[in-house]
């Protein structure tokens, strides 16, 4: 498995970055709204750190050996955004038809916080998508593909991605994860799935931000 050291560092940093705000809240009970400032800075700095570590991966994984041009990567990212939004609409509609709730506790909580502290949206629109693509697509999917095959690696990566969100909509997040794996595989550039992920989150967040 290529780039084991960098991959391990990315995974460790990711867990530290995501755990840090909770650890601080548990240790300092009087942080109040400052925790959202801390979390925003934490995610943005964390994204930069993970990008730096990923850039040290000198040997491309099998998915990255024949990358498309940057123009094609951009177009694939835009197409992926449309596909993931349409796919979400279809899955949520089917969920409703089956009599299950389509409400997302995760999304509702994030939007509620963002309405009070708009700067927090930077963490969700930029920091989180960049880190998640590096962890779930580049590291997990990219490194497992030679061992389990691309389909097996995509399924494993997407299951982890869905569990990480702990939202109750397992199939929805697994679908999103699989689509981002597909974009990464099609282009050989992790930036493609990053773009689609950032735009997907932005479509949800911007109406709330602009309507504030």
Identify the residue ranges that each predicted region occupies.
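Juxtamembrane helix-loop-helix connectors linking adjacent transmembrane helices
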Residues: 31, 61-128, 146
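Alpha-helical transmembrane spans of integral membrane proteins, capturing the lipid-embedded, hydrophobic core
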Residues: 11-19, 40-48, 77-85, 89, ...
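Structural signal for the C-terminal ends of transmembrane alpha-helices
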Residues: 51-61, 183-187
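Alpha-helical transmembrane segments of polytopic integral membrane proteins
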Residues: 21, 47-54, 87-91, 132, ...
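Transmembrane helix-loop-helix hairpins at the membrane interface
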Residues: 116-212
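Non-cytosolic membrane-interface motifs at loop->transmembrane helix junctions
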Residues: 32-40, 104-110, 178, 182
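Transmembrane helix-loop junctions in multipass membrane proteins, especially transporters and channels
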Residues: 26, 30-31, 55-62, 92, ...
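Alpha-helical transmembrane segments in multi-pass membrane proteins
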Residues: 3-57
């Amino acid at each position: 498995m290529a780039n084991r050291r960098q991959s391990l560092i990315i995974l460790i940093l990711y867990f530290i970055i995501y755990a840090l705000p909770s650890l601080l809240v548990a240790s300092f009970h009087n942080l109040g709204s400052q925790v959202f400032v801390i979390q925003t800075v934490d995610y943005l700095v964390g994204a930069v750190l993970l990008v730096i570590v990923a850039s040290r991966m000198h040997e491309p994984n099998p998915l990255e050996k024949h990358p498309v041009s940057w123009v094609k990567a951009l177009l694939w990212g835009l197409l992926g955004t449309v596909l993931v939004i349409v796919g979400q609409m279809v899955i949520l509609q089917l969920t409703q038809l089956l009599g299950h709730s389509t409400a997302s506790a995760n999304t509702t909580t994030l939007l509620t916080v963002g309405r009070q502290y708009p700067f927090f949206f930077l963490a969700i629109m930029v920091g989180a998508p960049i880190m998640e693509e590096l962890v779930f697509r580049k590291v997990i999917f990219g490194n497992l593909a030679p061992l389990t095959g691309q389909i097996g690696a995509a399924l494993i990566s997407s299951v982890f991605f869905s569990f990480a969100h702990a939202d109750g909509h397992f199939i929805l997040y697994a679908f999103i994860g699989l689509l981002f794996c597909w974009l990464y595989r099609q282009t050989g550039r992790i930036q493609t799935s990053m773009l689609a992920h950032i735009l997907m989150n932005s479509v949800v967040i911007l109406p709330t931000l602009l309507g504030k």
